[in-house]
Amino acid sequence: MSAPETTAPLQPPAAQAASLPGSLAESLASSGITELLAQLDRELIGLKPVKARIRDIAALLLVDKLRAARGFSAGAPSLHMCFTGNPGTGKTTVAMRMAQILHQLGYVRRGHLVAVTRDDLVGQYIGHTAPKTKEILKKALGGVLFIDEAYYLYRPENERDYGQEAIEILLQVMENNRDDLVVILAGYKDRMDRFFESNPGMSSRVAHHVDFPDYQLDELRQIADLMLAEMQYRFDDESRAVFADYLARRMAQPHFANARSVRNALDRARLRHASRLLDDAGTVADDRTLTTITASDLLASRVFSKAAPAAQTPAKE
């Protein structure tokens, strides 16, 4: 497999920033946005088109601030978004960073993220949905409302479903409070497309559609290294090769969830690592032993079992 395309750092190089007009360079330096974009670049492997869109939005808001300072006004841009992609591709993480960026650039007051699903918005009885939806919106004002699997709000097969009531309230707030609230709808691309086809009012209010691609094998290996480093673990040479084999097998099986499956696999490897140390009473508990995931901690996975081929039931991580 060829190496994935290298993602350029999100932050403008120092030389580029210095060449900008004085006020723009000063605004860039004082905004703190460079550090936030660099943090996102470190946290997320790959996702080049996603990072490019975030940088574009940050640039628009920064330039709008400069324009406003000089008396130019184009009105607040609509920044409601739709994030599409498979599980584990970083949608929630990007939404969290987006909230911080929007706050840093003065678009929203608080910069917090409120993440919800249908169950948080839609009631089971008459008169129950409106209060639930309005309470969530009240919490989200000044920040970002992230609605995961948003297409479940609309269930046309059930005439008595109250999801449409929640949608109508959302539409009103998205229009009237768009300078103090950003709504991000998330889910699988095909289902979100059908949702927008059935709800043209929602489609017309969402200006930015960002697709999160699945990770490639090498990117998943890098993600695993980052996750282990955060937990103060490491692979040795043998276990790193075994984990690459594990990923190749697991990616071919059902219900693979990108970075989420990587984290699950590492959590189970940590369990096996701990059990292995306790089972060997003579183990010397030095730093290397306590922090190194070995090949045996990975090979115990059912992914390597011939009894569970990829075409049949999904293996445990």
UniProtKB/Swiss-Prot annotation:
GO terms for molecular function: ATP binding; ATP hydrolysis activity. ATP binds at residues 85-92. The keyword ATP-binding applies. InterPro entries: AAA+_ATPase, AAA_lid_6, ATPase_AAA_core, CbxX/CfqX_mono, CbxX/CfxQ, CbxX/CfxQ_RuBisCO_ESX, P-loop_NTPase. SMART domains: AAA. It comes from the Bacteria. Disulfide bonds: none annotated. Keywords: ATP-binding, Nucleotide-binding, Plasmid. Transmembrane segments: none annotated. The keyword Nucleotide-binding applies. PANTHER family: AAA-TYPE ATPASE FAMILY PROTEIN / ANKYRIN REPEAT FAMILY PROTEIN, AAA-TYPE ATPASE FAMILY PROTEIN _ ANKYRIN REPEAT FAMILY PROTEIN. Seems to be necessary for the expression of RuBisCO. Belongs to the CbxX/CfxQ family. This is Protein CbxX, plasmid. It comes from Cupriavidus necator (strain ATCC 17699 / DSM 428 / KCTC 22496 / NCIMB 10442 / H16 / Stanier 337) (Ralstonia eutropha). The lineage of its organism: Bacteria, Pseudomonadati, Pseudomonadota, Betaproteobacteria, Burkholderiales. The gene is cbxXP.
